[in-house]
């Protein structure tokens, strides 16, 4: 079950890398910097998607283990309609307040127009981004991992095909990358719509099922809240880091955007393993099969460590070619190589955090997972970024994420061990 999830995660990585890669082929570091500055927008969209998708999939897995098919219908319908409504509201805010939002993110006169073009088109795709991502989690919870993977691949393949057409062929640059992303998410959303209506016998899109009262809504959101907080605070910390780096010029901003995308391979590879087995965690807990739960946890952590170590080693030896693949600018490449080394220091062990958090969510212990998310992307990371920048400058600031990762990994192991007892 985890293999399609891993493939879906890698597809997501390729999806996110595509925009930066094709914009980088324009040879304009300012456009790469502009796309980097808008990263928080996509991260925030994924925060909502993760809240509905991860929360819903965990509750659906438990409901399936209990053979409660009526709850599955209500949860799936609620997730779908909530995703579309939140996406539409998010788009309205982006379109109405584009300029102040981008200035808050650190855009200046040289990057603003590029960032604005990208943001406007991403806004139009917001409902589809949220629902297609949330639906992939829900479909996987039903045991249809292959179908979830297909949905992700449809959006990614479309994006990869359309990126060069809009970015270079039609000369739209950064805005063209956003157009391709929006169309890709629309196609993925159409596929999941087909699955809900024609393939699944348990899911529902009926509005009457979505109006399920506050009980299911609270359960979904509370379980998915740790993952959503993880993404939302990642948005805030990304903005903070961008604002710190802007003081050193646009080259470090462009470099960190590339490093974020490149490092996603290491992170999402392990996140895919953890997410792929979450239905097993939920089903095993719902059915009272504690041995299966524990065996799955141990095996998943071992897999995360092995693939994390291998990916980190690969990145270390190929660090300069990896950054150079995205942009042909010596200044950006120099910054990027240094930043990539700093970010991949926690690569072999970050999967332990994801597995521990998923275990906590699957047994209904959302609060500890929420606290860990807040620490990793907020309460610990953001002050640390400012402190390290003040003491060690740019080189210190880019070490903040890896230091925070190791602290939260250790805490998650201690907390989950106590819960498991």
Indicate where each model-derived feature is located.
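Short alpha-helical transmembrane segments in multi-pass integral membrane proteins
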Residues: 1-2, 60-127, 169-225, 281-346, ...
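Helix-terminus/linker motif at the lipid-water interface of multi-pass membrane proteins
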Residues: 14-33, 102-109, 165-172, 232-265, ...
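Residue-level signal for transmembrane alpha-helical positions in Major Facilitator Superfamily
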Residues: 14-15, 52, 93-97, 127, ...
């Amino acid at each position: 079950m985890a293999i399609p999830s891993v493939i879906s995660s890698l597809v997501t990585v390729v999806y996110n890398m595509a925009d930066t890669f094709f914009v980088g082929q324009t040879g304009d570091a300012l456009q790469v910097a502009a796309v980097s500055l808008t990263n928080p927008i996509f991260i925030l969209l994924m925060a909502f998607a993760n809240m509905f998708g991860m929360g819903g999939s965990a509750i659906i897995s438990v409901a399936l283990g209990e053979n409660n098919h009526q709850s599955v219908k209500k949860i799936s319908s609620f997730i779908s309609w909530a995703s579309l409504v939140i996406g539409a509201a998010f788009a309205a805010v982006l379109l109405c307040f584009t300029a102040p939002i981008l200035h808050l993110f650190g855009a200046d006169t040289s990057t603003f127009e590029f960032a604005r073009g990208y943001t406007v088109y991403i806004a139009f795709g917001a409902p589809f981004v949220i629902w297609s991502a949330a639906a992939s989690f829900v479909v996987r919870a039903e045991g249809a991992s292959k179908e979830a993977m297909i949905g992700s691949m449809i959006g990614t393949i479309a994006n990869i095909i359309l990126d060069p057409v809009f970015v270079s062929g039609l000369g739209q640059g950064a805005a063209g990358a956003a157009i391709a992303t929006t169309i890709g998410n629309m196609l993925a959303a159409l596929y999941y719509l087909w699955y809900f209506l024609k393939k699944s016998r348990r899911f529902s899109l009926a509005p009457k099922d979505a109006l399920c009262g506050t009980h299911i809504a609270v359960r979904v959101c509370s379980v998915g809240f740790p993952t959503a907080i993880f993404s939302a605070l990642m948005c805030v910390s990304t903005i903070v880091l961008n604002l710190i780096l802007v003081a050193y010029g646009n080259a470090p901003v462009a470099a960190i955007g590339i490093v974020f995308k490149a490092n996603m391979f290491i992170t999402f590879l392990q996140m895919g393993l953890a997410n792929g087995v979450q239905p097993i965690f939920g089903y095993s807990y719902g059915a009272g099969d504690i041995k299966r739960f524990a065996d799955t946890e141990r095996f998943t952590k071992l897999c995360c460590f092995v693939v994390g170590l291998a990916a980190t080693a690969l990145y270390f030896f190929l660090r300069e070619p990896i950054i150079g693949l995205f942009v042909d600018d010596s200044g950006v490449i120099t910054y990027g190589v240094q930043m990539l080394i700093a970010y991949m220091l926690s690569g072999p062990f970050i999967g332990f955090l994801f597995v521990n958090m998923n275990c906590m969510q699957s047994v209904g212990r959302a609060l500890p997972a929420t606290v860990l998310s807040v620490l990793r992307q907020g309460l610990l990371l953001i002050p640390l970024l400012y402190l390290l920048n003040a003491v060690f400058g740019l080189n210190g600031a880019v070490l903040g994420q890896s230091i925070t990762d190791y602290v939260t990994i250790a805490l998650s192991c201690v907390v989950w061990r106590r819960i498991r007892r």
